[in-house]
Swiss-Prot record:
SUPFAM superfamilies: DNA helicase RuvA subunit, C-terminal domain, Nucleic acid-binding proteins, RuvA domain 2-like. One of its GO terms (biological process) is DNA repair. GO terms for molecular function: ATP binding; four-way junction DNA binding; four-way junction helicase activity. Residues 1-64 are annotated as: Domain I. Gene3D superfamilies: 5' to 3' exonuclease, C-terminal subdomain (1.10.150.20), DNA helicase RuvA subunit, C-terminal domain (1.10.8.10), Nucleic acid-binding proteins (2.40.50.140). It comes from the Bacteria. Signal peptide: none annotated. Residues 144-148 are annotated as: Flexible linker. Pfam families: HHH_5, RuvA_C, RuvA_N. GO terms for cellular component: cytoplasm; Holliday junction helicase complex; Holliday junction resolvase complex. Its main location: cytoplasm. This is Holliday junction branch migration complex subunit RuvA.
Length: 197
């Protein structure tokens, strides 16, 4: 029903904020990630929104970026993941970190979200792994790239990509998206497919 809302940022509570527009205060549920990036109270903001209507509840959920809103909607497609759990997942760190954790099957990161157990994390990974695309040029990678490894095959694959002209940072990130059970040659081929998307 609502694509976005613009207005004055009035107040912040535990899991929602209040935005005033045309003398109406809107209660907007949001993630810790969005809350952390909000400007000072009293300033104007715009949030991309999704309205959820249930028999016993009507709520508006809002996020600073379309990417976070899209991830919120995607999480809601998982059986057992409601709006509260989706917000919890988005509050882990940022959208890129969550996407990366799902893509590489990092249950530990996903279960850091309050209310998300191992089985739910496994279901999220299973159902969303192939639906998520990661932009390897994104710059908010500090928390999601530098996976230290002693795997000789992985190190060799990274070195091979570096010789092809890719940066070590870019190579490390894309190698972590690949199936490490494959041969060195297969890992490099898979990595190049990701890089050429």
């Amino acid at each position: 029903m609502y694509e976005y809302i613009k207005g004055k940022y009035i107040d912040m509570y535990k899991d929602y904020i209040v935005i005033e527009n045309n003398n109406i205060g809107y209660k907007i549920y949001t993630s810790g990630s969005t809350m952390a990036k909000l400007p000072s109270i009293g300033e104007n903001i715009m949030l991309y929104t999704e309205q959820i209507v249930r028999e016993d509840f009507i709520g508006i959920y809002g996020f600073l970026t379309k990417d976070e809103l899209s991830m919120f909607k995607l999480l809601l497609t998982i059986n057992g993941v409601g709006a509260k759990a989706a917000l919890s997942l988005l509050s882990i760190s940022n959208v890129s970190t969550l996407k990366y954790a799902i893509k590489v099957g990092d249950e530990k990161t996903i279960t850091r979200a309050p209310g998300i157990g191992k089985k739910t994390a496994q279901r999220i990974i299973l159902e969303l792994k192939d639906k998520i695309e990661i932009d390897i040029s994104e710059e908010d990678d500090e928390q999601i790239i530098n996976k230290v490894t002693d795997d000789k095959k992985v190190l060799e694959a990274v070195a091979a990509l570096v010789t092809l002209g890719y940066s070590e940072k870019e190579a490390s990130k894309v190698i972590n998206l690949c199936d490490k059970n494959n041969s060195l040659e297969q890992i490099i081929k898979e990595a190049l497919k990701h890089l050429m998307k």
